[in-house]
Amino acid sequence: MRENRGWEVFSLLTSTEVYEERVVEVPEDVQLTIEGDSFRGYTLKAVGPKGENTRYLKYRGVFIEVGDGKVRVYTTSPKKKHKAMVGTFAGHIENLITGVKEGFEYHLKVVYAHFPIKVRVEGNEVIIENFIGEKHPRRAKIVGRAQVEISGQDIYVRGIDIEECGQTAANLEQATKIKRKDPRVFQDGIYIVKKP
């Protein structure tokens, strides 16, 4: 069984037929560098106007090449999983480039019917006080380098990493989840209203 697997990996490396390919354009104001290979994984580093970000991508049989202002992601395997990973890698690279060029922003709204919710940032946490009249404040973690800005009933989560911003926004939404009550009646909470 091991011999077959070895030949399979060898054939991936030596095969010249490309079964799936995606090309991602790199803007002029973004510098993208790549290190590694398909076996050890690729470390992509993007530097742009908003800052710099890195991403580690690894899937054997999926190859990444950078050159001439383009990133080429392709596979020499006819398998569905390899073809699917080409699209996944291309999506991650696009998000990496967009993050350092424009950044990402999630817009959330604080909604309450009776008890006014007080929201404030404290260190790497968002403190939610007086939620449905609770005495104990609820907390939501700010992930990584995401920035949280509170403006009245609006909360903005900004950053260059879409996963950090998305997880921070999700943490805020989950922190105000009401359990064991009718959600049609108790609609207080913090809700994502706009995603990037």
Curated annotation (Swiss-Prot):
Coiled coil: none annotated. Gene3D superfamilies: Ribosomal protein L6, alpha-beta domain. The keyword Ribonucleoprotein applies. The keyword Transmembrane does not apply. Keywords: Ribonucleoprotein, Ribosomal protein, RNA-binding, rRNA-binding. It holds the Pfam family Ribosomal_L6. Signal peptide: none annotated. SUPFAM superfamilies: Ribosomal protein L6. GO terms for biological process: cytoplasmic translation. One of its GO terms (molecular function) is structural constituent of ribosome. InterPro entries: Ribosomal_uL6-like, Ribosomal_uL6-like_a/b-dom_sf, Ribosomal_uL6_a/b-dom, Ribosomal_uL6_arc, Ribosomal_uL6_CS2. GO terms for cellular component: cytosolic large ribosomal subunit. It comes from the Archaea. Belongs to the universal ribosomal protein uL6 family. This protein binds to the 23S rRNA, and is important in its secondary structure. It is located near the subunit interface in the base of the L7/L12 stalk, and near the tRNA binding site of the peptidyltransferase center. NCBIfam families: PRK05518.1 (NF004037), uL6_arch (TIGR03653). Part of the 50S ribosomal subunit. This is Large ribosomal subunit protein uL6. It comes from Archaeoglobus fulgidus (strain ATCC 49558 / DSM 4304 / JCM 9628 / NBRC 100126 / VC-16). The lineage of its organism: Archaea, Methanobacteriati, Methanobacteriota, Archaeoglobi, Archaeoglobales. The gene is rpl6.
